[in-house]
């Protein structure tokens, strides 16, 4: 609706992908066709003025006509933030998953590395996932700790519905040493 408001035309928007419920997107890419010419700054101001406070456009640029946000993307990156503390998170509760058990970082790293490469991830998707191909290629994994936060980053050609959430949940169960 934000683009329709500033272009006064019905505009089809292509997104690079969906996010699962409760997931926050950084650098989500989308594209649309328009004949309207504006400076980048004016596009950004106009779109942002018509978006909710929780969404912001940071960059705008022209792309070739055959560009498609979803199918031109070669990689998607997902960071999962765990707050690992006995104390309740005060400011980051909507941006992290709270785990009170002490998690073994080396176990997390070892388990995460097992996902690298091309695999069938059927066991790591939602029962409502409609993807015809459960085979995905994970090209990068990383684990960082900052104070009580554990940040797990995974890059792949694509993800299945709830794939990272289920993978990380499984790794957390293993890392609890229960």
Predicted features by range, described:
Residues 2-178:
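Structured-RNA-binding interfaces characteristic of tRNA pseudouridine synthases
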């Amino acid at each position: 609706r934000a683009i329709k408001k500033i272009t006064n035309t019905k505009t089809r928007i292509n997104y690079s992908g969906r996010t699962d419920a409760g997931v926050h997107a950084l650098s989500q890419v989308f594209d649309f066709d328009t004949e309207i010419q504006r400076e980048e700054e004016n596009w950004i101001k106009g779109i942002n003025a018509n978006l909710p406070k929780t969404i912001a456009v940071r960059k705008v640029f022209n792309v070739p006509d055959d560009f498609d946000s979803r199918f031109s993307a070669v990689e998607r990156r997902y960071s999962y933030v765990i707050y690992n503390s006995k104390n309740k998170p005060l400011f980051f509760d909507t941006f992290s998953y709270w785990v009170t058990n002490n998690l073994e970082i080396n176990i997390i790293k070892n388990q995460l590395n097992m996902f690298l490469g091309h695999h069938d991830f059927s066991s790591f998707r939602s029962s409502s996932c409609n993807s015809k191909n459960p085979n995905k290629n994970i090209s990068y994994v990383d684990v960082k700790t900052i104070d009580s936060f554990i940040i797990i980053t995974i890059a792949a050609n694509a993800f299945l519905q709830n794939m990272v959430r289920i993978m990380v949940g499984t790794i957390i169960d293993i890392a609890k040493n229960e």
